[in-house]
Amino acid sequence: MLWGAASSNAWAFDNSLAVKTLLQKAKADLVFVKGGTFKMGDFGPETTRDKLPYVPSYGYGSPAHEVQLDSFSISKFKVTYEDFDAYTDALSKPRIATLRIDSKYRKVPNTPAGVNWQEAKDYCLWLGKVSGLPFDLPTEAQWEYAARSRGKFVPYATNNGKYEEGRNVASYEQKQEMMRGVSSPQVYPIGKFPPNPLGLYDMASNGTDWVNDWFSENYYAHSPRKNPRGPETGTEKVRRGIATDYVTALAMYRQKQAPQVKPSTLDDGTIISDRHPNNGFRCVVNSPSKVLP
């Protein structure tokens, strides 16, 4: 069976051109990931010559453990501000990133949207409701499995498994060139560097991705083997991908943050940013079959 036709009872379907265009793009950008079993977490002690971990203790990558996943599809690109605008416009919601710092990022076309966790979750679920497809945020396990091209023992989710500034991830100078008008930019337009072997872009660069899971420091010690979805509750959500440098860019590195980002303010109380431009996301479709474009 191939998913593709919209459900006859799709929720609140908006026939606007912008929504139709977004749905076409969202489906066309999906990469099918065949399910399988892999060793999730820091595989350094088991695979490297010196038997040392890749991930420092503050990256929560241990212990490595076996995980089995069903097949799914994941977007090759992060969601952009243009994509997110189509969603908020369709629901008559105010557009995001209009404050002093955030608005500078959205002025550059195809820049990843910086959002809070609930906004990312709601966007993916909305895509599911208007398309009839089981869209959602990826689980942490799905994200790492796809980043490592179906669980290969590669430390970085780049075209060659290495982190090479200026070649497969952006250098500081390249970020400045792509994001003129933004001081010390953290993200830049999507798809500017080669994808990983699975065909996914910006998995080791260009900000982090929110995933579905609540964060627990010790979750790996008792994670279920099949299709783990993280703890039942928590206070922080997991983010994957690069935050600051080559260490946080490791495919096994885990980051945590409160679902609602605390606004940045000036001394006089003026809010200059109510989201973090570095907090992006992409969606998955939880179907065992490929999705028709």
Regions from the PLM with identified roles:
Residues 39, 106, 111, 117-263, ...:
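Functional-site microenvironments in short loops/helix caps that host divalent-cation chemistry
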